[in-house]
Each structure stands twice: as structure tokens, then as C-alpha cells.
Amino acid sequence: MVRVRAIHHSNIPKCLRCGRRWWATCHRCERTVRLTSTASGIWPLRLLRGAVPGLISGPWLPFSPTTRPIYALQLLSVNDGPSPVAGSAPNRLDNGASVARALPHPAGRLAVATQQTKAGLSRQAKAGTAFRVAPNAYIVGATLAPEQAVAHHRTAIISMFWPGSVLSDRTALTGGMPFEGWIFISHPDPARRSDLELPGVTVSVRVGPGPLPGDMPMPDGLHISGPARRLVENVSIAGRPPRGRPSRQAGTELVGDEIDQVARQGGAGAVHNVLSQLDAISNHLPAGSVGVVRSLLAGVLGSFSGSKLTSERLAARLSGEPYDEHRLSMFRGLAELLGDTAPEPRPALGSPQRWTWEPFFEAYFSNFIEGTEFGVEEAREIAIDGVIPSERPADAHDVVATYRIVSDPVSRAVAPASADELLDELRDLHRILLAARPEKRPGEFKERRNYAAGYAFVEPDLVVGTLRRGFDVFSSVTDPMQRAVALMLLITECHPFDDGNGRLARIISNGVLTAAGQVRIVIPTVYRNNYLAGLAGVSNGNGRGESLIAVLRFAQKWTAAIDWMTFEATDEQLRRLDSYMDPGLAEASGIRLRLPEQT
């Protein structure tokens, strides 16, 4: 039984085309008036005719001018009644089923032109309520653009022409999505062998196996190539490249990248699974391509005997130093940006005495950023006088170790000239920095992935390879400040150790500046959120690093403006500039880091 209540007749809108007031469809011009689907379920009366029992009672339903319901009924309850819209839902509605499920979809519905429906569909197409997408295929009632509507019905359209086909080749690598406007499929005996041009996409078919073990089902009876099959299908083959469309094969290099991704995400077990799938389907696929994939998979397991690899990622994995391609792409973007950015040298002017207390405050703020919080007077006693509080010896050692590194003339000027030097310096400095925390494994790269606020840093087995290749990416960056920015991002993104990574990134970056006679970068507490936001902007893909460059340049400018000659004068100046203020409180109060001349 269906219970409904009526909407007042005065709410019927006019036909969008001829202006006359009719029901869901104007009988004079056959132009359908749109309905707005709602969770409560507003259905046009014509569609409910035959499903509504004899009497319709109840109060008039108020309406919103924005929804403009056509002469309609609101469904109050459904109890195993017949579907009001033929063909748009199952023959019987489940108890409590949502009415919105049966309402028109913005992408319309796909209709096949038969002898009985061809004339009607043609009239609808002329009236603008339907459009032809392929021979004998129409989309009716769509409010979306043709390209968007076709994207919604893509698998159904493919199934109309090639039932049981497989989304294969390059399309399998894109998860079934078009590549440069093309979809590639295979079918054992295609009835249509020419390309099918649809709005926004062209479907290209080739003769090939139907679904094989490991292939995954898709809507409308289609399948998509499984992990092993899609690797084989995308191996480069000899021959002239096609004209007017991309190659069906992504190429052996991308196949190697895919295998590297399998090994990275699932380890040796995932590689073994793909090999097992390959054994099960090898008789259905080209032997040469199967051999290439088998050799690459075996190489990941330690028995590669093939020729030179075309995939740098897979070659790096087989050499024992896989890397994070996503991070390298990030580093390339920053390197390009730095190459297009004019340098702004800021030499450390004045006598050495002017910078006497800079190392202490740098160490103090660097630890405070990481959560090792002491009052500045207490931190002075710890770092300078060697007074270690009994209740926090490890925290005190963090301050002492950082101060020792940044105040030493040699370690404060570390500027690695090669990737090997960078790796050695990182390990050596980490041993000093975390000497009081043996549980953090000083000097040893991490064995578990680390996170910050849900953001995942480079995986442990990719750290060395990413550091090496990232250092090479930045080899073209020669300006000291720009190189400091680059190494800051490189070390931060890799996060190579269990702890102490932020302090190490700042130490190495400042070492590059000191070695070139430039002003170091101090990040006071009030500026912490700006600093982290600059790093997060690059991590999250919000630009190539523009905000990070701006943040670090201002911090360097601020550092150059402070007089670091005596503790008392420096402390008084920093307090006047609100440098010790909690960053959250500062943001809430509208306070920001200021230069001395701005006070």
C-alpha cells in the first residue's frame, strides 16, 4: 500500500518550452519539465498513476519556490507496492526504500532504439529531451552535458556493442578511466571492429581473450584486466606507432614502475601472487611479453637475469635502493621554482661578537618547536652552565646536544657536497643529537614509517634511495639560501629517523648558509605555525614551494635584524617582539612575528 498527500494545483510550473501548464511532460511540445529530487520523495502524479490506491487524502503540502514541484504527491510510506516508474526500479519496492532511488538521474537513462521505440526516441531527440550517442543508442532526460552523461553510462554503452568485453591494455592501468580520450578493450570475437566515437571518449577494440583468472568484474557484465594480465598487455611491442591515437601499450618502462609499486605496497608476497596469476594465464597471452614480465617479477625476488632495465624505479629497487617517485616529483617542482626565483643573498655582517648568543637561541627555539619546552632562563642554565634537571634529563640533553652542534665552528658549517656526505652527516649528527635516547636508535635510519598529523613520510625502505636521488635533483640549485630551502624539504619529507628529524633538517640547512657566510635561519616559537604551514603546503601539493620560500626568507631576514651580542639584550628584544608567544594564542590574538623596526 502507498500512502501519499497532494500538492496544491497552483504550484504546477509552466512548460519550459511553450509556457503552458501541464504535468510532468507538456502534451503539446513533449518537453519534459524538470523535477528536483528530494530525500522525502516528490513524485509527479503521472508517474504514480496506477500505483496509488483509490483515495488521496490529507492536507495540502507546502512547497519551496526553489524546488518548484510539478502537480505531485509526497510519498508517506511504502509497503510492498508496485514500482511507479516502469523500468527505473525493481518491480517491487522494498519496505522503507528511498524514493530518490526511482527519481530521474541527472545523467538520464540509456535507451536502445528498437522498431517500436525508434520513432519516439527520434522525436525526443528533436525536442531536445534526448540525444543520440551511438548507433541505436540514446540518452534520455539528461540534464548533464553529453560528455558527462556518457561517462556515467560508459560501461553500459560498451556492453551494448561488445558484451563480456575486457577493459584492457593501457585502460587497465588507469583503472578503467580514459587515457587522452581513449578507452581500450579486448573481445574474443567483436561484432564491431571499428572504433566507437562517443561524446568525450573513443572506444577502441582489439581481438583478445575474454575474462581470465585474476580479472576483476566491472558493471554491466564487463571485466578489467587483473594485476598480471595488465602487466603483460602493456609491454612495449615492435612496430610503427599508431596515428591519431595513443598507443594501446603504456610501455615496458611503466610496466617496471607498476611492478615496483606492487613490491612497495605488498612486498615479496604480493610479487609471488602476481607470478602465480601469470602462470595461470600465460597460455592465453603473447609468450614474449609474458617472458619480459616474468623476468622483471623474478628480479624483485632476487633472480633477475634480463637485459638493461628501462624503468628507473625498478632498477633502483633491484640495486637495493628503491625510492619514492612521488617525493622526487615534488622535489623537481621545487627545483624548477628555485631555478626561476631570483636569489636574495643575506650575508652575516658585523663582528663575530654580534652573533655570540645566536647559537643558544637557535638551539632553544629548535627544541621548543619539537615539544621540548623549557623556560629560556632554565634552558640557559642547562646549555651553558650544565645544570641538568633530575626530573627531565633526556629533554635537557636534547637542548645541550643541539647547542653543542650549532655552536661548534665545524658542525655548524656542515654543507654536504654529495649524497654520500649527506647520509654520513645525517647519521653522525643524529648520534650526537639523540645520544641520551637509546630507544630512538641514534644514528640508525627508521624501520617503521612515521607520521605527523596523519601525514605519512617516506617509507623506511625508500629512505636512502629517496635521499640520494633527491640530493641529485637539487644539484642544480647553487644559491646558499635556495639550497637551504631544498635540503630542508628533502630531509623533512624523508624523515629518515625515529625522532629528531626537524632539528636535523634545520641544522643541515643552516650549515649550508654558514658555510657560504650567510645569515642562519632561526624559527621563534611565535612563528612555528607559519613554518609548519610552509612545509605542509608543499607536502599537500598547494603550489611548488612558494609559501615555504617566503616563510624561510622572512625568518632569515628577522634573524639578521636581531642583535645577538648579549643574552639580556637579546632576551629583552625577543620579548618585545612576542617571539616566545604560543603560536596558537598569537594567531587568535592577531599577533605575528615582527621585525625590530616594526615595533
Model-derived regions, located:
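Short, intrinsically disordered terminal segments enriched in charged and Pro/Gly residues
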Residues: 2-6
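Flanking scaffold residues of small Cys/His-coordinated metal-binding clusters
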Residues: 10, 21
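Cys/His-enriched microdomains
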Residues: 13, 24-27
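Short Cys/His-rich metal-coordination motifs, predominantly Zn2+-binding knuckles/fingers
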Residues: 18, 29
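Cys/His-rich microdomains that often coordinate metals
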Residues: 22, 33
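FIC/Doc superfamily catalytic core
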Residues: 44, 55-111, 118, 127-132, ...
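Minor-groove-contacting beta-hairpin "wing" of winged helix-turn-helix DNA-binding domains
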Residues: 137-142
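Short, structured active-site "lid" loops
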Residues: 150-161
